[in-house]
Amino acid sequence: MVIASPSATFGLPEVARGLAANASGLPRLVRICGLQIASQIALTGQSVSAEEALKFNIANKVSKTQDSLVQEALEMAKLIASHSPDAVIVTRSGLREAWQQASVEQANRVTQDRYSKALYKGENAKIGLDAFADKRLPKWLPSNL
């Protein structure tokens, strides 16, 4: 996840230096924002602003001010940390697998095989479902995954 300050810029300047962005930047950029935008960024060597990065899905959010960036990032981190640690671990792994695998089915299979049984038999799954049914906030246990 990317939270950018209003003055941040994003780009692949390699082409302007006589190089190519071969450290996995090109395929990642194409997956994030599509071939047209990735081509513009990679072939021109020009940077895009934080607002453009947000529009192109390179950034998740632009902070209100330069000074509020850390606080806004911490707020997002606290929200994530408020959820079941088991669910966060498995969800993050699934996201990474989807990012790295060419096939949606393959990514799903790897995540399911690695975590499903432990996640759904774990105490945090029961805690979360019970809290939902009781309309209260869950009190998570440390992850055992």
Positions of PLM-derived features:
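C-terminal long alpha-helix characteristic of the crotonase
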Residues: 3-8, 50, 59-107, 123, ...
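CoA-thioester-processing core
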Residues: 1-42, 56, 72, 76
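Short, well-ordered beta-strand elements within core beta-sheets of diverse protein domains
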Residues: 38, 42-43, 59-64, 117-120
